[in-house]
Amino acid sequence: MSTPPLAPTGMASGPFGGPQAQQAAREVNTATLCRIGQETVQDIVYRTMEIFQLLRNMQLPNGVTYHTGTYQDRLTKLQDHLRQLSILFRKLRLVYDKCNENCGGMDPIPVEQLIPYVDEDGSKNDDRAGPPRFASEERREIVEVNKKLKQKNQQLKQIMDQLRNLIWDINAMLAMRN
């Protein structure tokens, strides 16, 4: 799944781009393309916000006290931003087309098949029925052990009460003797 090299932002391909750099640029996977696309979208949003900021601050030259030099500067900035915005959209389109080309062989799975339904009959539910049964058996065993523990605790409490009563009786007889 190798793709043709994309020129990274701010880097010019010149005499310093050796064969190792070209090889690394050719091996761009789909995840890297998606990251580049995300960064491009962020740049587009940033440029668009700057364009709206310029348009908001820019007044039309209708004879109102407005300097033509300032107007020309802002107009130049606006045209530059629009030119860069069109370049970014072309770059985004290239990234989008390349991602679709790389993922073209994959068959998309409909979302409805990815969502498990309770009343769905099939082998998928049979596979999933194993662990809940095991959990219910384990739960039943825990309940039984708890019942046995409560019974043992009750028996120990009765024995302790009997010993307490015996000690009281012994102490009472010793007290009467003296």
From Swiss-Prot:
Keyword line: Acetylation, Activator, Coiled coil, Nucleus, Transcription, Transcription regulation
Lineage, uppermost ranks: Eukaryota, Metazoa, Chordata, Craniata, Vertebrata
Keyword Acetylation: yes
One GO cellular component term noted in the UniProt record for this chain: nucleoplasm
Identification of the protein by name: Mediator of RNA polymerase II transcription subunit 30
Compartment(s) where it occurs, according to its Swiss-Prot or TrEMBL record: Nucleus
Any Pfam family hit: Med30
Annotated function: Component of the Mediator complex, a coactivator involved in the regulated transcription of nearly all RNA polymerase II-dependent genes. Mediator functions as a bridge to convey information from gene-specific regulatory proteins to the basal RNA polymerase II transcription machinery. Mediator is recruited to promoters by direct interactions with regulatory proteins and serves as a scaffold for the assembly of a functional preinitiation complex with RNA polymerase II and the general transcription factors.
UniProt-annotated stretches for the region Disordered: 1-22
Molecular functions per Gene Ontology: nuclear thyroid hormone receptor binding; transcription coactivator activity; ubiquitin protein ligase activity
